Amino acid sequence: MAAPLKLISHKLCPYVQRAVIALTEEGVAFERIDIDLANKPDWFLAISPLGKTPVLQVGPTAIFESAVILEYLEETQPKPLHPSDALARAEHRGWIEFGSAVLNDVAGFYAAPDEATFNAKVSQLGQRFARLETRVAATPWFDGESFSLVDAVFGPVFRYFDVFDDIADFGILAEKPKLMRWRKALAARPSVRAAVSADYPVLLRDFIDRRNSWLSGLQARVAA
């Protein structure tokens, strides 16, 4: 890949994290440029039709949407993270979409305005993870010994719970031993660790505080 790569990023964005993990795993050099999504610069809006991160700039060309970025890397790098078998690749793509659905549920969890909505989101997340528990391999990664794009997607998902667990034990991952082993393995993976800055937990807690949600109120009570 001859063209210089720039990844337009936001420090908390889980979709950026999955792109960073994939780039790192594939040994691709890139420059990361963080922006403030609450005050998007004009140059960013000019290259991001949806106004979202991540955007991967490959020379003069801007690639937007994390799924597209991941597939571009798969097609251009010598050591792809997808399985070589077509059917297995298709299944992995399905679980990547499942991971995106879980992220939507996580957003509903931290933004829930009242206790009833919050509890419904807790239940929904528990059901999502219970389904995932039935599929994930007992060995370190999603599908066994090889780190895949599904692993890159769920590293950022589990990272949220490092902060959520400091607020309270919501029981979402309880009695899911394979997920807990997977979560621990992902947390120790260098590419996953390097996908965020050291101040990520502080930034996420501040983000939650500003949601004016049920979780932000609970976080404030715990901190008091």
Task: Label each region the model flagged.
Residues M1-S146, K176, R211-L215, Q219-A224:
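GST-like domain detector, emphasizing the conserved glutathione-binding G-site
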Residues C13, A152, L204:
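Functionally engaged cysteine thiol sites
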Residues E74-P78, S100, A137, F158, ...:
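Hydrophobic/aromatic-lined pockets within catalytic cores
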Residues D105-G108, I167, V192:
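Charged, solvent-exposed alpha-helical segments that act as regulatory interaction surfaces
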Residues F142-I167, I172-R181, A185-L186, V196:
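GST superfamily/GST-like fold recognition
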Residues K184-A224:
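Long hydrophobic alpha-helical segments typical of transmembrane helices together
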